Structure formats: structure tokens, C-alpha cells
Amino acid sequence: MGDVHESISEQMADWMAAQPMFFVGSAPLSGDGRVNISPKGMAGTFAVLGPRRVAYLDYTGSGAETIAHLRENGRIVVMFCAFEGAPNIVRLHGRGRIVLPGDESFDQLRASFPKERTLGQRSIIDVDVQRISDSCGYAVPLMDFTADRVVLDRSAERRDEEYFERYGQEQNATSIDGLPALPPR
């Protein structure tokens, strides 16, 4: 049986920080729109900003579903699972907002993340957490963490800002359902 919490405790924040990956879920308002779940990783890209506020650093990817869904309706869930140690699942349901490079609060939020690479960062997803819950996770498999993948970092090293700007406008301007994602710059 799961528990609902009033706030993110220090113990919960430490546990989330120790997980090598998390998942982000979002959906459009349309009943025939596609639900999206994205795995997220890379050390230093998630931050607990307060007892009911979290954020993650969003790098350029093949799609922009979460951004499109947040622009349309703001709904988001962030989920962590224990793949090592005691079983546990934490879900953070809330309302998210997209903070783009150049936005007034971007630099202040960016300082919350230890991840140093800035090339290819597309946004920060800032979440006002409305429901915090945990559950057993007894069916989540045990897996050994080997290392963070470095493919995205190495790929970014071969690019420049113009590449990411062009890619964002050509590949991340809309969701797979045609919702607006990254705004023109």
C-alpha cells in the first residue's frame, strides 16, 4: 500500500538523487492524443528545489512531447524506481512549466544543477508538485547500474549552438500529435 506525503523529505530527496534514472509522463488533452513517457538520466540533471518543487535539465532529443504537453495543459508526473537496494517507487504529480535559455529565471534555475555541459540544453522543466506518493515497487526488477551513457555528451561536443537552434526548429517545433512544442526564437 502506498503513502501520500505532504512534502519531499530530506530522506526522499537524497534517495531520488541517488537513482541513476527517472521517468517523466505527460499527455495531451485530446482523448486520441498520445501519452508520452520519457526516461531521463545523466547525473546532475535533477534537482529538488523545495518541499513541493523539483526541476530537471532537459537536453535536445528526438522529440519534444513533454514540452508540447506542458505548453498545452501543464500536467506532468515524475517517477523514480529503485533498481538496486530496497524496493521503492516515488511519484511526483504536478504542474510543470518550461523555462527556456534566455528566459528571465533560466540562469538562476540552471545554477541548481551540477551537470556542467550547457551545449544542447533545450530547457529546464520546473514542476510545482501537487501530490507526492511512494509505493512498494516489489515487481520492479533488480538491475546493476554500470555507468551513465556518454553518447549524448560526445554528440554535443561535435556540434555548435547553430546546430541545436536549427534542430530545435526543424525537429522539435511540434509534438507527434502536431501540438506546438519549442517556440520560434
What are these model-derived regions, one by one?
Residues 1-185:
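Binding-site signature for planar aromatic cofactors or substrates
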